[in-house]
Amino acid sequence: MFDDQDEIHPLLAGAPQTTEFRKLRKRIVREVREAIETYGMVERGARWLVCLSGGKDSYTLLAVLHELKWRGLLPVDLLACNLDQGQPGFPATVLPEFLSRMGVPHRIEYQDTYSIVMDKIPQGRTYCALCSRLRRGNLYRIAREEGCSAVVLGHHRDDILETFFMNLFHGGRLATMPPKLVNEDGDLFVYRPLAFVAEADCEKFARDMAYPIIPCDLCGSQEGLQRQQVKQILDGWEARSPGRRQVMFRALMNARPSHLLDPGLFDFLGLATAPRAAEERQDEPPHLRGEA
């Protein structure tokens, strides 16, 4: 796709000059391009709001998108955005300093959603669901203010698999986070270009690049017990059968409504055998007609 000796975007400057890292980088870039092309995420001249939390996944997303744009392979404008939600101990200067140093256009927004969550959620319960909803609403608002057509999130393959099994085990439905959707108001796309990328690859990429990672548990809340349990199940399957995660992920791209049970997806009532004139069967010998 490109020569490793070519000039690269500052976000990838200082990348380890090892064969292992070059393979990792090329794999992630290839998988992001594949997701973008498979789900039709690109509208030439569009503007994307790329959400940056300061975690390994969003750093990986930001770097790869800027690398593609740098090489003329992604014809959109990119605006990085971090929403400072007022969590105690949040290092407010880390991201703006990093983005400025890298020459990345960005917007840092302060909205104290932390206080709202603490007021609404009883002690001992996980804050993640309400926190996520409040964050998403603010990101949609910012996208509109900045003239963006899409909000771009850093969910990867493992997030998508975990959400599928959480819905299966606890929600009684076959559903997950799609790589592309339209928000409820119908005015913004939501994209997940890391949909084909493994979490382990994001973690290694961000670690090797020494990006300034900000922990996601500053509020003191941990991931919900249900997601932790699903992670453990998937980890166990992967340990016993390496490659199992990728097989399961491919299944999400290979649904057969006629082999499921949802009459809303397949017209079982209208199902009929292929028409065959009775006269044609009369020409068959009795033993073929089941009469012998």
From Swiss-Prot:
UniProt EC number: 2.8.1.-
EC class of the enzyme, as a word: transferase
Motif interval(s): PP-loop motif: 53-58
Cofactor: Mg(2+); [4Fe-4S] cluster
Statement: the UniProt record of this protein carries the keyword Kinase: no
Any one Gene Ontology cellular component term annotated for this protein: cytoplasm
Pathway the protein takes part in: tRNA modification
Assigned keywords, A-Z: 4Fe-4S, ATP-binding, Cytoplasm, Iron, Iron-sulfur, Magnesium, Metal-binding, Nucleotide-binding, RNA-binding, Transferase, tRNA processing, tRNA-binding
Binding sites annotated in the UniProt record for [4Fe-4S] cluster: 128, 131, 219
Reaction equation(s) it catalyzes: cytidine(32) in tRNA + S-sulfanyl-L-cysteinyl-[cysteine desulfurase] + AH2 + ATP = 2-thiocytidine(32) in tRNA + L-cysteinyl-[cysteine desulfurase] + A + AMP + diphosphate + H(+)
Biological process per Gene Ontology, one example term: tRNA thio-modification
Cell location: Cytoplasm
Gene Ontology MF annotations: 4 iron, 4 sulfur cluster binding; ATP binding; magnesium ion binding; sulfurtransferase activity; tRNA binding
Cofactor binding note of this UniProt entry: Binds 1 [4Fe-4S] cluster per subunit. The cluster is chelated by three Cys residues, the fourth Fe has a free coordination site that may bind a sulfur atom transferred from the persulfide of IscS.
NCBIfam families noted in UniProt: PRK10696.1 (NF007972)
Quaternary structure and interacting proteins, as annotated: Homodimer.
HAMAP family: TtcA (MF_01850)
UniProt similarity note: Belongs to the TtcA family.
Function recorded in the entry: Catalyzes the ATP-dependent 2-thiolation of cytidine in position 32 of tRNA, to form 2-thiocytidine (s(2)C32). The sulfur atoms are provided by the cysteine/cysteine desulfurase (IscS) system.
Further details from the record: The thiolation reaction likely consists of two steps: a first activation step by ATP to form an adenylated intermediate of the target base of tRNA, and a second nucleophilic substitution step of the sulfur (S) atom supplied by the hydrosulfide attached to the Fe-S cluster.
Protein name: tRNA-cytidine(32) 2-sulfurtransferase
